[in-house]
Amino acid sequence: MDVNGPKRWEPHRSLDLNPRSTPVYKSPLQEPCGVFGNKGTTKMSGVVIDMGTGICKMGFAGQTRPTYIVRNIVGCQPKRRTTMEQPKMEMFIGEAAHARPELTLMHPVRNGIVVDWEAAEFIWRHILENDLRLDTQDHPLLFTDPPFNPASNREKLVEVAFESLHSPAIYVASQSVLSVYANGRVNGLVVDTGHGVSYTVPVFQGYNLPSGIQRMDLAGHYLTKFLAEKILRSSFAVKKEDMDTMENIKQQYCYVALDFQKEQGRPDEKFRRCLKLPDGQMITVGKELFQCPELLFHPPDTSGPSSLGLPSMVEHSLSTVPQELRADMEQNVLLCGGSSLFTGFEGRFKTELLRRLGPEAHVVVVAQANRNLSVWIGGSILASLCAFQTRWVLREQYEEHGPDIVLRKCS
């Protein structure tokens, strides 16, 4: 793949907006345009940046998947001094940082929200300039925006994009709205469970319905820690290399039980299996493999604003939706995020949801195979549309109105 990406939308490249046979409402999304080219702007492809808690996804608008998927960490250490000058920091991102035990690691995002802007900017700049090899002055940037993101964070983002990255234009788009677009819809109830946070958001005609948003500070990272403590039988802090191993075990072997109590009641020996760790030692795992993702359905009381579990969160979100929209939402329940990829998740989720809503509910649960990329794909679709090109926040508008312009144009 050419790391520089296409400079213009190529007509033979297409995005599948309807990958499933599930009924889809006709979308107002128009044919892709793929260039940023209104008065006073450049004719270069936009870049979509989805900054999750665990992973940063980045690539060109109009592509079907991100060009770079990078672990969202920065590692630093002082450079060796050869003169009496002040020591400078040597910095790495992603796997390059994670593989160096001598580095001090920084995690720029916590529970979906950027908390370290210096580290976040370093990741963006590194991928844009060193990996994609582009001049940020020539490319508009579309950033994704999580639920409950403070307005001050959006303003800071605009400031970094214009003042530091020198982008000609930016846009900040709701993650849940982008997930709806990725599913070929403009209406839907998004159920997103990723690395740091889970939430449910009803979306109507491309806008969030704020009163229906439910959030739970329990997602993939919490599950990995739970699995580590269960398997290692320790309440002490787990080492970094242990967490890596547990993450791999979680992704390869954990599953969601269709009937948790029935599974729990089966003899322990039915579940025992021995796994060899990277250091050569053997460990035994068992019921932890389905107890781990069960927390998404029955979380502990310490999991943040909502301790309801995902199906109950959907029920609460639906209860806030105007009655005339409820059937539309029930028929467009969209699973998104990497922590929804467990084997058995989709079936159990739908069973639990139907049990709560009753037999009269006509629930349609949509679970695309690439749903861990839903937010980025939605951003790629949006930023490539001709009808969208007038919605970019331009540098001239920022210079005239200041960073609060994003609150007006990106609502």
From Swiss-Prot:
GO terms for cellular component: acrosomal vesicle; actin cytoskeleton; perinuclear theca; sperm head. Its main location: cytoplasm. Residues 1-23 are annotated as: Disordered. Coiled coil: none annotated. Keywords: Cytoplasm, Cytoplasmic vesicle, Cytoskeleton, Fertilization. Residues 1-15 have a biased composition (Basic and acidic residues). InterPro entries: Actin, ATPase_NBD. It comes from the Eukaryota. It is found in: Cytoplasmic vesicle, Secretory vesicle, Acrosome; Cytoplasm, Cytoskeleton, Perinuclear theca. One of its GO terms (biological process) is single fertilization. Testis-specic protein that plays an important role in fusion of proacrosomal vesicles and perinuclear theca formation. Interacts with ACTL7A. Belongs to the actin family. This is Actin-like protein 9. It comes from Rattus norvegicus (Rat). The lineage of its organism: Eukaryota, Metazoa, Chordata, Craniata, Vertebrata.
